[in-house]
Amino acid sequence: MAKKNRLNTTQRKTLRQKEDEYIENLKTKIDEYDPKITKAKFFKDLPISDPTLKGLRESSFIKLTEIQADSIPVSLQGHDVLAAAKTGSGKTLAFLVPVIEKLYREKWTEFDGLGALIISPTRELAMQIYEVLTKIGSHTSFSAGLVIGGKDVKFELERISRINILIGTPGRILQHLDQAVGLNTSNLQMLVLDEADRCLDMGFKKTLDAIVSTLSPSRQTLLFSATQSQSVADLARLSLTDYKTVGTHDVMDGSVNKEASTPETLQQFYIEVPLADKLDILFSFIKSHLKCKMIVFLSSSKQVHFVYETFRKMQPGISLMHLHGRQKQRARTETLDKFNRAQQVCLFATDVVARGIDFPAVDWVVQVDCPEDVDTYIHRVGRCARYGKKGKSLIMLTPQEQEAFLKRLNARKIEPGKLNIKQSKKKSIKPQLQSLLFKDPELKYLGQKAFISYVRSIYVQKDKQVFKFDELPTEEFAYSLGLPGAPKIKMKGMKTIEQAKERKNAPRQLAFLSKANEDGEVIEDKSKQPRTKYDKMFERKNQTILSEHYLNITKAQAQEDEDDDFISVKRKDHEINEAELPALTLPTSRRAQKKALSKKASLASKGNASKLIFDDEGEAHPVYELEDEEEFHKRGDAEVQKTEFLTKESAVMADIDNIDKQVAKEKKQEKKRKRLEAMRREMEAAMEEEISGDEEEGKTVAYLGTGNLSDDMSDGDMSDSEGHLKKKARTVDYSHGHNPSNSVDDDIIEVEEPQTLEDLESLTAKLIQG
């Protein structure tokens, strides 16, 4: 085997100097690069390092897309970026390349901790980003980690302290920030939010705020999505004030022009379908497109499960798959891999795969249920027609949804064409569904759950002009699922759909008057008021009635007394002592005594307490005094005073809030420091135990010295097994003059190693005698 050449100190120093010069030249090129003057078309035209270029070239990334050419130079120069682009335009590379280049220019190592944090709203998108990063960063020395739900937390905790680039979902990242001792974000260089509008919405608001509060404020932030948010409040939460807006959308007057939200190669269609006929149309569509690769979006995981199981039993003639958020992570990953490899397949899915996932060669995207807004529509149809390829989309709209939702699409310059259904191609599957649900109780249960989940999804939608809950044909929809009737649904504060409609249409005043008595007064329900232990004590009943067991005992004693005397004296006559009269006022029982000593009862008898404060002159004043009206008006208008007071108090509360955040951050850091200290002590204790164990083992074995220090030291390097098991004849060389330098011709005594005390004594005697 060839010997590996090691560089000496001079060579290593020269290599470091060359690397420093290369990085400085790279920084100079980045500062001098102006994307307005020279717009790059290829990755090699950008000022990026050779290892990154090599990884891109090996992964077949040669030509830049529009979003990459616009955003990468700005990100390389260190600006915060708010980027919006079409779906399938290469946004992942647009933020991964700046992340790698930033850490490369900073000479980042595993000892520097976490350098970049990439947050994704879904597990599948996080996995896709991680795979792309490992491909293009294969020639760099950075460590990357993926943390998502469904994986082993302990396995991630053991390794997360050595990660340079961390990719994950918000919930799992926050969990590691709270629990991982070695995860330090104080030196973070870059924060990236993929599908930023989804990460910033109400679903992830608290989680994302908690993550951002632990990060360094000097970081660089990149936000990427196909539908971008420019809300000032959202951007302020991320400390994003001086940022650059780039992308394919033209920014005019602070608003994004959404003219090119969907790819130009995408053909968009819609059909008007009654709710009860949706499954018939879907099954007919699948039967007529057996040679295609399609994704069918439904609103809930229960619907996905029901449609998949029923269609699978009816065998439409194409491979069927299903994917939703309630599946295990392994099943979701396997389904994605199978769908990517297949060419003729139908995938039933929820919005868990609506964003960012790169599915190859998808022909059709079918939306059975209307999306909650236009942004969701854009992300759904973006699963096809990616990277300039052709694709088609179809959305099914009920007559109640059609007019309002098409207006919202037209407002975003999206105009889908209308398709008419051929009656010859339409096939009713209602009898088959009824037969399947009658034979299989599990399918019937799934159908009921699918019905309930769809109705609830309509009920909770915000856009009431599109989603009209009162006009839902529930009986017809239940019949179309194969159910005998509409199941009863419990809403928040409403037992059934009928009660919900009745309560919605009922007059409010009539409902208020129904609680009034004959005099027209509304009686409050005292049963809902809290009851104290004193209330419960005085509400006790039948306290004078004794138990049956006690009555039986007293009855037997009374019979014994009657047998002795006919008349018995209970008490002799006596005189009342006036000195004993005050004792009659004392409590007669412990309960009465406890009540007399109760602070609550005594305070109730005294009335409400009044707190006073004293001024400098010693006069008492109530804590809250009403100001004179004339003095109040002297200070100005009431609305102006109100605004000034709110502004002043808001500033005070903001300062207190910042202090509270700093205290919470310091407590969290102190908690981590204590964990690290405890781990260090455990490691030191383990090392001390090992050392003490080795010393004790060394004391149990005694060696006979040779008089030569070097020989003794070499003998001490033996392993424990050699010292205990090997029993060789030991040669002891002692000269007459006790000089080790004498010749070897002097007297030599060969003896075996002593085994017992007698052997040792005989050997000592021989040595003394010479």
Swiss-Prot record:
Motif DEAD box positions after renumbering to this chain: 194-197
Tell me the compartments it is located in.
Nucleus, Nucleolus
EC number(s) on record? 3.6.4.13
- Catalysed conversion reaction: ATP + H2O = ADP + phosphate + H(+)
Q: Which SMART domains match?
A: DEXDc (SM00487), DUF4217 (SM01178), HELICc (SM00490)
Subunit structure, as described in the record: Interacts with the U3 and U14 snoRNAs. Associates with pre-ribosomal complexes.
Q: What is this protein called?
A: ATP-dependent RNA helicase DBP4
Q: Which organism is it from?
A: Saccharomyces cerevisiae (strain YJM789)
